[in-house]
């Protein structure tokens, strides 16, 4: 079963917790054992799993990405001027798999699933595929 999420981002760089949306879709499907695939079809956005208890972790991650991949660099040649967004997206990755067992996502105590925007604000698409 496949669900399409439309995500409206509000900043150039942000991490949006989509864990609840993934959990809600899992409940809709009735799948009790299998896997969830969360996929982002964009070259300047991505999907990651990371801590969701302390909001400063997201801020720190975005700050550190900016340190490694500054928005403007004298050697960048990409005509759209968003090479940093492409680099961040490649670092994070386009997808994540999560095991499903007993009708629940198997995530660590502090883990959440994040849609990562690196070239916003925009309306983005994210796919969730439940397999079981």
Swiss-Prot record:
Membrane-crossing segments per the record: none
What is one Pfam family matched by this protein?
UPF0047
- Signal peptide boundaries: none
Q: Could you tell me what this protein is called?
A: UPF0047 protein YugU
Family to which this protein belongs = Belongs to the UPF0047 family.
Which InterPro entries is this protein grouped with?
A: UPF0047_YjbQ-like, YjbQ-like_sf
